[in-house]
Amino acid sequence: MDVLTQCIVGISLVLFGIYGFIAILIYSFEREDKLEAKRRNEIIEYFTSNGFKYNDFSTIFPNDVRDFNIAHTDKKGYSVKNYIAETYGQRDGVDITIVDHTYLESIGRQRGCYEHALCLLRNQEIKIPDFYLRNRIFILDSIKKLFGMKEIIISEDKEFSKKFVLQGQNEEEIRNFFNSSIRQVFILNQKRGCEYESKNNSLMVSKRKYFLFMTAGYLNVKERIELLENSLKLFNSFKS
């Protein structure tokens, strides 16, 4: 094989590799688009048949969540990318909105893109103190406490305080609110990847989907239904 032929073969192999890689990328993007379209259609079918309305993009929701820290709005270190697949309606006298939310988080020069679902529940007749609650991460939270992390420990309920980190400004009001029945509802409905925050008598639930130790995109319709039912069960427990 002469030098010219070797060059032609080499260039052909390189081009084949490049075009093959591009073809794989195009296939991956098309497959992802099809899966996302299927997911949204399933969400539309279920929620609209159960009294909810649907928007591909939310323009109202960002204004409702600006005060919530777990919404990761336009605060320092965060920038909102979009609110999509919005479903909203009313159940048991509670106004409920669920959206898929993508945001960018900047720490120094590093920037990461994250997805989670947000469920906002409101009923003006239900009074809730402002609080934040999440699952305890034992090693990480032990380190945070060494650096001054403050939390509200329910000493009479070791199971609850072992499972959750509870925080808020008005400790006495929060302690009175988190009675044994409400604590038990949280324990029974504990889910991986969930955070809870109350502001202005509204409850927001953030739910992340995980694969092993990494976040894994948006919730499917079954997972969104589960988020709805569990969040509503929690919120209704506040009525008593």
Question: Can you describe what each PLM-predicted range is?
Answer:
Residues G20-Y46:
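Transmembrane-cytosolic junction motif
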Residues M1-V14:
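Feature marks short, highly hydrophobic, charge-poor N-terminal signal-anchor/signal peptide-like helices
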